Regions:
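Short conserved micro-motifs at the rims of enzyme active sites and ligand-binding pockets
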Residues: 112-113, 178, 204-206
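Short, acidic, Ser/Thr-enriched surface-loop or helix-capping motifs
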Residues: 183-184, 204
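N-terminal beta-alpha lobe that positions the nucleotide/phosphoryl donor
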Residues: 1-166, 175, 250-275
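Short loop/turn segments at secondary-structure transitions that flank enzyme active sites
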Residues: 107, 173, 200-202
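Conserved catalytic alpha/beta cores of large enzymes that bind or transform nucleotide phosphates
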Residues: 191-280
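Segments forming glycine/polar-rich beta-alpha architectures that bind adenosine-containing cofactors
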Residues: 175-183
């Protein structure tokens, strides 16, 4: 999952990664075992006799998420998260830094199934109490209708799943997006594809806006394709915590989101990451 990959990039490469920490998969199992949730969840899941029945699926998932959110996290686990957040605050010389809390499920990267992107991410989270709550919300997001349906169809045991929550310093980006070390439009592994949009990256990941698309040749490190798409809205931080949607200024809506220099800098990081993992 992303927790281990981010840790590896932080310690073994010079690719810039926002500081942070992660709860472990063991912490998730500890939470559901110490509180008796595992047996309660097993009982609720037993009622899911027909995953194609959307009403039944939704009802079961609502109850699963509710059971998790209603259950207080064990105090020692809360204390461990609080200490890690305070250590991050000390490292960043901030009292209560704004962070992103992201889900990293142990089932994300099985060879015959793709579970990635099925759990939730929370941005601009402020204060230890909110971090603890959002970690629990990440746990609950393992049981959205979509995630449960997919695991059922894959024959994956819901109670074998575990989740690590990644807590990273929030980056208040003017532009953000995703990057691939292959051109996903045609499968060409000699090119890097970068997609970017104004604001925070969740609108790109969620398909809410159509990002700009840039293609860079790996060998020559030259920009070979630029596709600029009009963007009329973006997601930004809300003062005090959380996020909000605002209009993109009229003058910027048809402009290229990233400069050519930024695109090539990002492509350089992509090559380093690919080389580190031995993919190219």
């Amino acid at each position: 999952g992303k927790s281990s990959s981010l840790g590896e990039m932080t310690s073994k490469t010079d690719v810039p990664v926002p500081y942070g920490f992660a709860t472990t998969a063991h912490a998730y199992r500890y939470f559901i075992d110490q509180t008796g949730l595992r047996e309660k969840m097993r009982s609720i899941l037993a009622e899911l006799t027909d995953v194609e029945n959307s009403e039944l699926l939704s009802s079961v998932c609502v109850r699963l998420r509710g059971a998790i959110m209603e259950q207080e996290m064990p105090q020692d686990l809360q204390d461990a998260i609080r200490r890690a957040y305070e250590e991050l605050a000390h490292k960043m010389n901030e009292d209560e830094p704004y962070v992103a809390v992201r889900s990293s499920a142990t089932a994300e990267d099985l060879p015959d199934a793709s579970f990635a992107g099925q759990q939730d991410t929370y941005l601009n989270v402020h204060g230890a109490d909110q971090v603890i709550r959002k970690v629990k919300e990440c746990y609950a997001s393992c049981f959205t209708d979509r995630a449960v349906y997919y695991r059922e169809k894959q024959g994956y045991d819901h109670l074998s799943l575990a989740l690590s929550a990644v807590v990273q310093m929030m980056v208040f980006s003017k532009a953000a997006g995703v990057m691939f070390t292959v051109n996903v439009a045609n499968g060409d592994d000699k090119n890097i594809m970068i997609e970017g949009a104004y604001g925070l990256g969740e609108y790109v990941v969620g398909g809410i806006v159509t990002p700009d698309s840039y293609v860079v040749s790996k060998d020559e490190m030259k920009l070979i394709s630029v596709s600029v798409n009009e963007q009329d809205k973006m997601l930004i931080r809300k003062p005090g915590g959380d996020t909000m949607e605002v209009p993109v200024p009229e003058a910027d809506r048809r402009k290229q989101t990233l400069t050519n220099a930024q695109i090539l800098e990002l492509a350089g990081y992509a090559k380093k990451i690919e080389a580190h993992y031995g993919c190219y």
